Amino acid sequence: MSRRADGRADDELREVRITRGFTTHPAGSVLVEFGQTRVMCTASVTEGVPAWRRDSGLGWLTAEYAMLPAATHTRSGRESVKGRVGGRTQEISRLVGRSLRACIDLAAIGENTIAIDCDVLQADGGTRTAAITGAYVALADAVTWLGAAGALADPQPISCAIAAVSVGVVDGRVRLDLPYEEDSRAEVDMNVVATDTGTLVEIQGTGEGATFPRSTLDKLLDAALAGCEQLFAVQKEALALPYPGVLPEPAEPAKRK
């Protein structure tokens, strides 16, 4: 099997690292690294839900994604300064939210909101898939925090793990976890979000330079699901460690007058 520019085999992930407790204030805070791509993922818990969700007994999970101005070789202006959020940013924010809502029972968290924030510190391809993979771990820590606070109706509201990875056809070969150098010239580019139960959450795929046959799609999915299995193992190893911060005390029941 031929080696890629970074020395990896076609079916090999970049080195993946997940660091919990990266910052101290959110209920969940993770630094996820896929090679040179680095994303900070936080999960903050707030009491209450959006107006359209009130009195439903259901919680909510929302997500925002953004890139720091110097995350790439050429500095980009902050979208907050521009006064509008770009289409790519909105698309990825919604993707992260959809992906994580697929694994959590929102009825179990009561009328609370979990806000996921994914900030790309350094980009070298695969930022959205790294964001989803790291945000799942931050979400798991936020659920632990809610459990300690006595806010869960179900002690285990997360039904499965969620991970995501990019795959593509580069130089005529199916390759896993594309860095920018490969992503920018891929003939086929695809992002796959999957669960550890073997099901798919979302597939985003495009023939960038040409069409591709069903057989190539099958090979891309096989490579992506094999990559996700490795990511689930990294997530599991990270979450095997104790909660990295200070957990809240359960709220005391109100005293009768």
From Swiss-Prot:
Top-level taxon in the UniProt lineage: Bacteria
PROSITE patterns associated with the record: RIBONUCLEASE_PH
Organism this protein belongs to: Nocardia farcinica (strain IFM 10152)
UniProt: phosphate binding residues: 88, 126-128
Protein's name in the database: Ribonuclease PH
Enzyme Commission code: 2.7.7.56
NCBIfam families assigned to the protein according to its UniProt record, in alphabetical order: RNasePH
Keywords: Nucleotidyltransferase, RNA-binding, rRNA processing, Transferase, tRNA processing, tRNA-binding
Pfam families registered for this protein in UniProt: RNase_PH, RNase_PH_C
InterPro entries, sorted: ExoRNase_PH_dom1, ExoRNase_PH_dom2, ExoRNase_PH_dom2_sf, PNPase/RNase_PH_dom_sf, Ribosomal_Su5_D2-typ_SF, RNase_PH, RNase_PH_bac-type, RNase_PH_CS
The family this protein is said to belong to: Belongs to the RNase PH family.
GO molecular function: 3'-5'-RNA exonuclease activity; tRNA binding; tRNA nucleotidyltransferase activity
Biological processes annotated in GO: rRNA catabolic process; rRNA processing; tRNA processing
Subunit structure: Homohexameric ring arranged as a trimer of dimers.
Function per UniProt: Phosphorolytic 3'-5' exoribonuclease that plays an important role in tRNA 3'-end maturation. Removes nucleotide residues following the 3'-CCA terminus of tRNAs; can also add nucleotides to the ends of RNA molecules by using nucleoside diphosphates as substrates, but this may not be physiologically important. Probably plays a role in initiation of 16S rRNA degradation (leading to ribosome degradation) during starvation.
PANTHER family: EXOSOME COMPLEX COMPONENT (PTHR11953), EXOSOME COMPLEX COMPONENT RRP41 (PTHR11953:SF0)
Catalysed transformations (reactions): tRNA(n+1) + phosphate = tRNA(n) + a ribonucleoside 5'-diphosphate
